Regions:
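Short Fe-S-cluster ligation motifs
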Residues: 45-61, 326-364
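Radical SAM enzyme [4Fe-4S]-AdoMet core and its adjacent flexible, acidic
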Residues: 32, 103-104, 108, 112-273
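Conserved phosphate-coordination/catalytic loops
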Residues: 36-40, 127-131, 292
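Conserved alpha-helical substructure of the radical SAM core
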Residues: 1-104, 108
């Protein structure tokens, strides 16, 4: 099969975070601060990524602003020729800090938002943060950077989609991504409390369609579909090892952010291998690349080139076998597993609350 070079790099600079969101998709076992790559090592990663064909990097976490050397990291990515986007909660962003990052080559910012009401936002995030987000939005807009909001949708905020769109307009965002929760990592522990009902999703989808028509090009609305409810498997990262790669805080390189959950994958690390070998030859990246690994019904399905068999991590989480068809797909032999979850979400369940993300005291 023909394999193209990657064009995007998700750089997870740290797992440390001031928020404790119950929908966090980072792994249960987080990388400690002492095990993180140094700024110099990140600079080498960016140089290798650019040489491989990568053109943009998302500087993420955790909260990347907790890295004191973030200005040096941004400058290194820019020097390597990569387009840089900061993915942040906004907590800790100040005018001088943002000015330093922009001077170093920061090109755009994505700011997370949990709700439009401060009390609801902070209940979801598990920390006081709404005022910091509002202040960060103002700073980003004043700096003239391309500015997007990201709202992870779940049972506690999906009914506020209309208000979230209004918030994006009020804060001056160019784009808002309304991303239904991906049930990986900590979010998987909270799936029962987080999963919205079919009716909630239908209402939210209708709101997005209506607002798209009304707003036109004034605000880009991105709706990340809820595969559990739609019956359509999500195309895993555009295909396993097809368009992007993730480097975790300790240098582990993954085809997708959740892939470390798969048993036997043995993901490589930039401390031991170069990115070009990792991309082209490592067993972790070739494991589910293409179609040769597929079993029926995926192997003979007309959608196999569209959804790539769905999410390997979700297939493993739900069935215990990463090679099975993603149960989110309505054609999957295990689709009843997902239907049962969705049907349960539609029943009155009282005031279920999610468990906030927990961190070890000696580090994240």
């Amino acid at each position: 099969m023909t394999v193209d070079p990657p064009w995007a790099l998700l750089a997870e600079l740290t797992h440390a975070c001031p928020l404790r969101c119950g929908y966090c998709s980072n792994p249960i076992e987080l990388v400690s601060r002492s095990a993180e790559l140094t700024g110099e090592q990140w600079a080498d990663v960016f140089d290798q990524a650019a040489g491989l064909g990568v053109v943009q990097t998302h500087l993420s976490g955790g909260e990347p602003l907790l890295r004191r050397d973030l200005p040096q990291i941004v400058r290194a990515a820019d020097t390597a020729g990569l387009y840089t986007q900061l993915v942040t909660s906004g907590v800790g962003l100040t005018e001088p800090r943002l000015a330093t990052l922009v001077a170093g080559g920061l090109r755009s910012v994505q700011l997370s938002v949990q709700h439009t009401r401060p009390d609801a936002s902070e209940r979801i995030a598990g920390a006081r943060s709404f005022a910091a987000k509002e202040r960060a939005a103002r700073l980003i807009r004043t700096a003239g950077l391309p500015f997007g909001l990201n709202a992870v949708l779940h049972r506690a905020n999906i009914d506020a989609v209309d208000e979230l769109i209004d918030l994006a307009l009020a804060w001056g965002a160019d784009r808002i991504e309304l991303a239904n929760t991906q049930f990986h990592g900590w979010a998987l522990r909270n799936r029962t409390a987080l999963l919205p009902s079919h009716d909630q999703i239908a209402r939210a989808r209708a709101v997005v369609a209506r607002r798209r028509e009304l707003l036109g090009k004034l605000l880009e609305l991105v709706w990340v579909a809820p595969d559990h409810v739609d019956g359509t498997a999500k195309p895993c990262m555009g295909g396993w090892g097809a368009v992007s790669l993730t480097v975790a805080p300790d240098g582990t390189v993954l085809p997708c952010p959740a892939a470390a959950s798969l048993p036997g994958l043995d993901p490589p690390n930039v401390r031991a291998h170069r990115l070009d070998w990792i991309w082209w030859h490592s067993p972790a990246f070739t494991a589910y690349r293409g179609e040769s690994w597929m079993r029926d019904p995926c192997r003979g399905c007309a959608l196999r080139g569209v959804d790539h068999g769905g999410c390997r991590c979700q297939a493993y989480a739900l069935t215990g076998d990463a090679t099975r068809t993603d149960p989110a797909c309505r054609l999957a032999p295990d689709h009843a597993l997902v239907r049962n979850l969705v049907d349960r979400a539609a029943k009155p369940r009282g005031d279920l609350t999610h468990v906030h993300r927990a961190y070890r005291e000696e580090g994240p």
